[in-house]
Amino acid sequence: APVRDVRETLTPELARDEDTSLLLIDLSNGLDRINGSVLSQCYNQLNITSEQNDSDPLNGAAGVAGVADVLDAGMLKAFFELMQSRDLRQQLLAYHDRSDGGLFAALVEMAFAARMGLEIEVPEVESILSFLFNEEPGAVIQVANDGVEAIINRFEAVGISCQVVAKPSAIQEVTIGVEGDTKILFNAARSTLQQRWSSASYEIQKRRDNPACADEEFQALADDLDQGLSADLTFDLNEDIAAPYINKGLRPRVAILREQGVNSQVEMAAAFHSAGFSAIDVHMSEILSGQVDLSSSGKDQFQGLVACGGFSYGDVLGAGEGWAKSILFHEKIRGQFVDFFERKSTFALGVCNGCQMMATLKALIPGAEAWPKFVANRSEQFEARLSLVKVEQSPSIFLNEMAGSHMPIVVSHGEGRADLSHAAAESLRGDSQIALRYVDHDVEYTDQYPMNPNGSPLGISGLTNDDGRVTIMMPHPERVFRTVQNSWHPEEWQDDGPWMRMFRNARVFVA
């Protein structure tokens, strides 16, 4: 079915609220068939019967003969239609299906996402193993305790079984008990289970990637204090500081610059357009052929220049370097860029591949002489994730009045590590040229993977020149300037994400 509004979707991440319950919606009429399940495959028993040997690890887990399947299409349809009702969805806090590993896998995956514990309580059944590990059609939902009875009644009214099976806990431990019995059948730390759950990926990662990074990521799973992503802003998220200038009806021209292999120009143009600019698509071939002149004046004058992300020339000449060399080694084009960068009324932004390109152009940019080159990530892999960054105090016109804020941002690069010594990084910090830095869950600057996805010293993720008109960064603010673009965000964020402020700051700069 089409997703008509991404704001109405649910994820398996539990709401960190202990006054809630997890409900199992069973679409199999309690059959609990376990043949062909992940559990049966783990024990290499793909045809479990009721006559298992006493020594068999799956003895007593036979359930009903057969494999999980949809037997009642009408029930599945009724479930789908009920889940689409707006009033029900507004009561749901989290959702996960049980078809990949069974109920236990679904429950602990929800706990992993929220870094919480669980108190699992199963009903009196013939086989607890079959109940917890069958992969029959079904789902788990999280709801507030005061709405449990009404929601159960709604599902039962259409012939679907629905029951409470777990409660979240701030104590990071997963326990299993039987309804009406105080005896605990199983208990384990959330961290232990999550490391076991991740162990196969960890072993592959150690062999494929930098093993030190694999170790750091694996050990981080055991940190019970890590509550994941967060956001704290030093500015009013909902204030449109560019509104007075947009209302004048004038739209300054900004060149959205791209080259063969660049792929982020559309999002970038949308962000600048939303901030009140006239975003002009400019391909390097147009500059090289003379169709576009960055030195133009009058109505054709550009007040902004933005180099977008992607993989110019497939990075085969070094990330961003082939793009930069087409400028550096072309006397006329080089002169245009020099004139543009030296004009005090202009600004420039380089993101991802554009950051790498502009770092290579540093000889043309006043006050950027100390910028580093960007090289392969410490992990030795392409990194695509949502990372946490903190805005530094710097002269960057893009980050004006944002210093001290920390919030998530998209990273997507293979060569994002700032190649400079610790002393050189400290020198940049002393000159207030570090604009953004990666931080951990304590909002402390970090070199640890994956919080620092590329290994840049001092967590460097963005830089500015000495007068702040030119800013470069490896993360992608244009991919998260709207709240709905974020895969995680605080509930109170409305239409605009915090990175929209960056583009509005540019509009205020040119007035």
What are these language model-derived features?
Residues 3-133, 147-253, 261:
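Intein/HINT protein-splicing elements and their conserved insertion hotspots or analogous self-processing inserts
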Residues 161, 345-347, 469:
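Proline-centered loop/turn at the N-terminus of a beta-strand
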Residues 165, 292-294, 338-339, 371-511:
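Amide-donor transfer/coupling interface in amidating biosynthetic enzymes
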